[in-house]
């Protein structure tokens, strides 16, 4: 019979569309997660504001063990360069479609809204694409 154990999870929103008086908000999302003794980052928002909020909240980006990218749009991936400057160890997992070119069609032409190609190239050893739903660590 499988044994169950209770594990605490703490979720902190670092940046999203609304804000409190002491934190920055922006169009985008970044979430910090503590689970089973590990620290995770889900997305980095559109800019460096997630990092400023993390610092304000006493969260060290250098301590994050693993990062995830939900999808390639700039409002979820725009802060990865700032993240890599503070964290030299975390692997980043993303679905295989996240590395695709993403464009927004406007009246004046197409605008690229995906992950900067130069960032994917510069940190290619840390980006890992997943082709199916899987566990990257037990329970995650």
PLM feature spans:
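Short, glycine/charged-enriched secondary-structure capping and boundary segments
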Residues: 26-28, 56-57, 82-84, 107-109
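Metallo-beta-lactamase
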Residues: 99-140
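Conserved beta-strand hairpin/beta-sheet module of binuclear metal-dependent hydrolase folds
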Residues: 9-56
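Active-site metal-binding motif and surrounding structural segment of the metallo-beta-lactamase
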Residues: 49-97
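Active-site metal-binding loops of divalent metal-dependent hydrolases
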Residues: 16-18, 44-47, 72, 97-98, ...
């Amino acid at each position: 019979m499988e044994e169950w154990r209770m594990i605490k999870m703490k979720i902190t929103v670092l940046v999203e569309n609304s804000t409190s008086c002491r934190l920055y908000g922006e169009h985008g999302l970044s979430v910090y997660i503590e689970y089973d003794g590990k620290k995770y980052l889900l997305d980095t928002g559109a800019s460096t504001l997630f990092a400023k909020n993390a610092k304000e909240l006493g969260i060290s980006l250098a301590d994050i063990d693993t990062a995830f990218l939900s999808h390639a749009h700039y409002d979820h991936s725009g802060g990865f360069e700032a993240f890599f400057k503070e964290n030299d160890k975390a692997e980043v997992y993303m679905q295989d479609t996240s590395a695709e070119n993403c464009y927004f069609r406007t009246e004046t032409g197409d605008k690229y809204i995906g992950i900067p190609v130069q960032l994917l190239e510069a940190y290619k050893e840390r980006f890992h694409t997943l082709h199916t739903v899987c566990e990257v660590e037990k329970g995650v």
